[in-house]
């Protein structure tokens, strides 16, 4: 056990951690140069295209130093804020972490968030300054930033370039020398944490585990602690870079894959503890709490016959993504679909993209919203995920909305505009720190609802892409909120309802109906687009009707003939207007997001 090293890699997006992981794999000789695919650790197409890590991956490597043989278990983690739940579980199964910072860009907001998670798990941190081959690299300045913002000693930071391979061997030696070996009692009852799970079409649900005490053997009867279910271990494997290698036992301190042959991945939940069924351990590795969704959106198939296929697709995605939650819902405008809960905006985009790509579905997504706690006059408390479900105004005593603590790190030249953006989003400043003369760290408390719309895009455009952002939920607070309904041709479209602060209802209503007017195709009758609070209409635009020349086929002749045709058309349009349905294009549902 003394020669095992379990370590994670934590970094902000684009600071080069997947490339660095590939270099470490290559340096350990686990993969030949020919087999080394770009980003071995990112297996999904979306991950490779977007250059982000979504699912935490793991790999077991062999390394020889001074004639001694070491086993390095590398646990790659996602860097994006939405996937911090995955990060926290990966860190719980590690003994140390490489903190990677880009030598040109410096410390970013998500780096700090993940460092705090690592500190909570008492991990040994090795600061690594990557991309030292870049012309703009300034390792000394970045080392100072690490000390200022995080407060850890960066004098012995390892300087590497994952692209050129400089400093990789020194880094692996540092891992062996500085990260502690795992501690655990090999004679105690089995105790292992599941830090990742996914679905394999041949083997069923697989759990990636780190064993803290005891060992797991093939054919052992194990118990999952959160739900008490018992299952037999059918197979055990080590995650090697290119293929999994079977093993009869996973010992204390090791990581491995457990095959339980289950059809449902919900049984194998990330963060849960596995123990021996006959001789269980007393307490779990960490208290299991399921990942909580923060952002909700309706997802509907464009073709209503695809509803069952969408259900199957969501079920299959949930096999690999335990944080995804969904329930069926119906919308008058969009038919049958699902209300899906996501960890954040990127998670929502990725899920929608995977549904469309991997399952060939055409989908419409409604605007995202958050959970509201609504207290009624009779003392009842209800949780509303969908703005269209908000009760009538006269029944509501008060509405509470979730607030988050937002951390923004930005070059100081964009500070003024970013503060204006945060104030417009109803944010209140709690802290401001200068990391050095060029970069500032801001902390604000902001309603979550303001973040899910378009905050991230605006932040990036104001700062030309240089500002970074991270958030954590804090609490629910009372807000003066109202439901803004959009009516098209006199009918409220439930999928377009949004919850807004009362003082913003009028400007937002005006912008929305104006956007909708541009998007709705012209009909043979005129269409009124209205924004309303309850029964009161606060804004209106009209989509003009198309003209059709019904008199074209009359040559000369009597005016009464033409008049008769025009009257007939007028009647037809009147009837059409009363029973006509307006087909709304997908852009209409996303126009809610564009509030400018």
From Swiss-Prot:
GO CC annotations, alphabetized: plasma membrane
tr-type G domain mapped to chain residues: 2-183
Organism: Sulfurimonas denitrificans (strain ATCC 33889 / DSM 1251)
Name by which UniProt lists this protein: Elongation factor 4
NCBIfam families: lepA, small_GTP
Protein function: Required for accurate and efficient protein synthesis under certain stress conditions. May act as a fidelity factor of the translation reaction, by catalyzing a one-codon backward translocation of tRNAs on improperly translocated ribosomes. Back-translocation proceeds from a post-translocation (POST) complex to a pre-translocation (PRE) complex, thus giving elongation factor G a second chance to translocate the tRNAs correctly. Binds to ribosomes in a GTP-dependent manner.
Locations listed in the record: Cell inner membrane
EC number of the protein: 3.6.5.n1
Highest classification ranks of the organism: Bacteria, Pseudomonadati, Campylobacterota, Epsilonproteobacteria, Campylobacterales
HAMAP family cross-referenced by the UniProt entry: LepA (MF_00071)
GO molecular function annotations of the record: GTP binding; GTPase activity; ribosome binding; translation elongation factor activity
Domain of life: Bacteria
Binding site for GTP: 14-19, 130-133
